[in-house]
Amino acid sequence: MAGLPRRIIKETQRLLAEPVPGIKAEPDESNARYFHVVIAGPQDSPFEGGTFKLELFLPEEYPMAAPKVRFMTKIYHPNVDKSGRICLDILKDKWSPALQIRTVLLSIQALLSAPNPDDPLANDVAEQWKTNEAQAIETARAWTRLYAMNNI
C-alpha cells in the first residue's frame, strides 16, 4: 500500500479488521484504491439470499471527492441503473470528507432494504415500484434468484 494516503491505509485496515456485517470489501492486489465488494441481500428485502458484487474505486481526490461505486451483479432496483450506477445522495452532492468507505457501504446496504422510487435512476423500475409494488418486489426476487445466487 505504498504511496497511498494514510487515511486510505487506515480505512482499509479497519474494513479488513472489523468488517461490516453482511459486507465484504477487499482491496485489489494490484491497485489498493480499487475494492472488490460483496453485499449480502438484507433480510426481509426482495434481495434476501442474494450476494451482490460491486466495485468501489477511490479517486485521486479522495476524501475530497466521493468514491465511485457500481453494482457488477444485475439488480432490479429503482435506484440502480442497467450499468450498475447507484443513485445515492452521498455519492453525489451530499458527499463530505467526513464520510468513509464504511459509511458508503452501509448506505448502499440500507438502500437495498429501502428502495426509493421517488429518486430513481431506473425510471421504468421506479414506475413499476410505484404502480404495482407487489409485482416489482416479485421481479426483484426473481432477478435476485437469477443473477445473485450461486454467483460467487
Swiss-Prot record:
Statement: the UniProt record of this protein carries the keyword DNA damage: yes
Domain UBC core: 3-149
GO biological process: DNA repair; protein K63-linked ubiquitination
Location of the active site: C87 (glycyl thioester intermediate)
Description of post-translational modifications: Conjugation to ISG15 impairs formation of the thioester bond with ubiquitin but not interaction with UBE2V2.
Keyword annotations from UniProtKB, A to Z: Acetylation, ATP-binding, DNA damage, DNA repair, Isopeptide bond, Nucleotide-binding, Transferase, Ubl conjugation, Ubl conjugation pathway
Record's catalysed reaction(s): S-ubiquitinyl-[E1 ubiquitin-activating enzyme]-L-cysteine + [E2 ubiquitin-conjugating enzyme]-L-cysteine = [E1 ubiquitin-activating enzyme]-L-cysteine + S-ubiquitinyl-[E2 ubiquitin-conjugating enzyme]-L-cysteine
SUPFAM superfamilies: UBC-like
Pathway: Protein modification; protein ubiquitination
InterPro entries, alphabetized: UBQ-conjugat_E2_core, UBQ-conjugating_AS, UBQ-conjugating_enzyme/RWD
Top enzyme category: transferase
Activation and inhibition: Activity is inhibited by binding to OTUB1, which prevents 'Lys-63'-linked polyubiquitination.
Enzyme Commission no: 2.3.2.23
Annotated family: Belongs to the ubiquitin-conjugating enzyme family.
Function summary: The UBE2V1-UBE2N and UBE2V2-UBE2N heterodimers catalyze the synthesis of non-canonical 'Lys-63'-linked polyubiquitin chains. This type of polyubiquitination does not lead to protein degradation by the proteasome. Mediates transcriptional activation of target genes. Plays a role in the control of progress through the cell cycle and differentiation. Plays a role in the error-free DNA repair pathway and contributes to the survival of cells after DNA damage.
Stored PANTHER family: UBIQUITIN-CONJUGATING ENZYME E2
Quaternary structure and interacting proteins, as annotated: Heterodimer with UBE2V2. Interacts (UBE2V2-UBE2N heterodimer) with the E3 ligase STUB1 (via the U-box domain); the complex has a specific 'Lys-63'-linked polyubiquitination activity. Interacts with RNF8 and RNF168. Interacts with RNF11. Interacts with the E3 ligases, HLTF and SHPRH; the interactions promote the 'Lys-63'-linked polyubiquitination of PCNA upon genotoxic stress and lead to DNA repair. Interacts with ARIH2 (via RING-type 2). Interacts with OTUB1; leading to inhibit E2-conjugating activity. Interacts with RIGI and RNF135; involved in RIGI ubiquitination and activation.
Name the record gives this protein: Ubiquitin-conjugating enzyme E2 N
Phylogenetic lineage: Eukaryota, Metazoa, Chordata, Craniata, Vertebrata
